[in-house]
């Protein structure tokens, strides 16, 4: 029998360890940060042949504590629907909605697998760092794809396998130690991470991961109840399984060979595009895809 996504290991985790770190001051946060896939700045990446449409309908699937509120704030004429399995995350969204009068934001406690029950369709569906936590990510991707309008875009962020090798090594260590999602285990995680040598594979990831500065981020990274990572081929297979057409990487530099005269990069550039991406993800070892 399939576990209820509203009461499984992932929803229990996010009920206790609220993630990401809640934003209290949206304008202050936005002064130095940006959200993945926010059409207020990224619309040309999704629709290169048209300008920004302020009245679009957007679904943020797995909104966490802040993401949909950011979208509603930066796209004030858009209609934003947010779903998540974590009630504390939705409660913080409610706080932000009330504080900033985000009347264009609707909140629902709903798993991605049941998103079709909304009875809506969308110009843009965003799922950032969520599908890789589902019991069956392909089912989740198909559920979201079914909500797209004919010219709609599904924007997904997944863990990239090669950039997370250090993380997966440490996850394995902590599983072998029998650690759980409790304060004692978290203390062991902190002590272990602090003891790693400068050449450990985790160090390059740490430099790109501000989440590791607070407890819920450490739990999410090293003690998660369920996650997996993806290669280029895995990503393309998910897109195909969802009945969609792959458009582009959001962060492109990690997948394309530089324009140099070296023989290696010339050899890579001679490959079919999908094979180029596969080769370069192993060269650059990006953490997110």
For each predicted feature, which ranges?
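Conserved alpha-helix/loop element of class I SAM-dependent methyltransferases that forms part
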Residues: 16, 21-56
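A short SAM/SAH-binding and catalytic strip from SAM-dependent methyltransferases
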Residues: 123-136
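Conserved small/polar residues in nucleotide/adenosyl-binding loops
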Residues: 289
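Conserved class I S-adenosyl-L-methionine
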Residues: 153-204
């Amino acid at each position: 029998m399939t576990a209820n996504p509203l009461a499984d290991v992932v929803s229990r985790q996010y009920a206790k360890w609220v993630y990401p770190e809640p934003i209290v001051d949206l304008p202050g946060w936005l002064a130095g940060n940006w959200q993945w896939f926010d059409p207020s700045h990224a619309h040309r990446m999704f629709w290169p042949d048209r300008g920004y449409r302020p009245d679009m309908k957007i679904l943020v699937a797995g909104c966490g504590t802040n993401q949909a509120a950011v979208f509603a704030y930066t796209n004030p004429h858009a209609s934003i629907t947010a779903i998540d399995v974590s009630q504390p995350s939705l409660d913080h969204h409610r706080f932000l909605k009330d504080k900033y009068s985000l009347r264009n934001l609707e909140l629902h406690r709903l798993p991605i697998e049941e998103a079709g029950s909304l009875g809506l369709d969308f110009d843009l569906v965003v799922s950032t760092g969520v599908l890789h936590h589902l019991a069956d990510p392909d089912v989740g991707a198909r559920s979201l794809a079914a909500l797209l309008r004919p010219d709609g875009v599904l924007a997904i962020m997944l863990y990239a396998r090669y950039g997370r090798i250090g993380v997966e090594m440490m996850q394995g260590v902590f599983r072998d130690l029998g650690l759980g999602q409790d304060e004692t285990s978290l203390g062991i995680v902190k002590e272990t991470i602090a003891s790693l040598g400068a050449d450990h594979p985790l160090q390059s990831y740490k430099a790109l991961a501000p989440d590791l500065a607070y407890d819920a981020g450490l739990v999410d990274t090293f003690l998660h109840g369920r996650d997996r990572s993806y290669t280029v081929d895995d990503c393309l297979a998910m897109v195909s399984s969802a009945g969609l057409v792959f458009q582009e990487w959001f962060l492109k530099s990690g997948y394309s060979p530089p324009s140099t005269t070296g023989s290696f990069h010339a050899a890579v550039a001679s490959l079919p595009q999908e094979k180029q991406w596969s080769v370069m993800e192993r060269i650059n070892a990006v953490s997110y895809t």
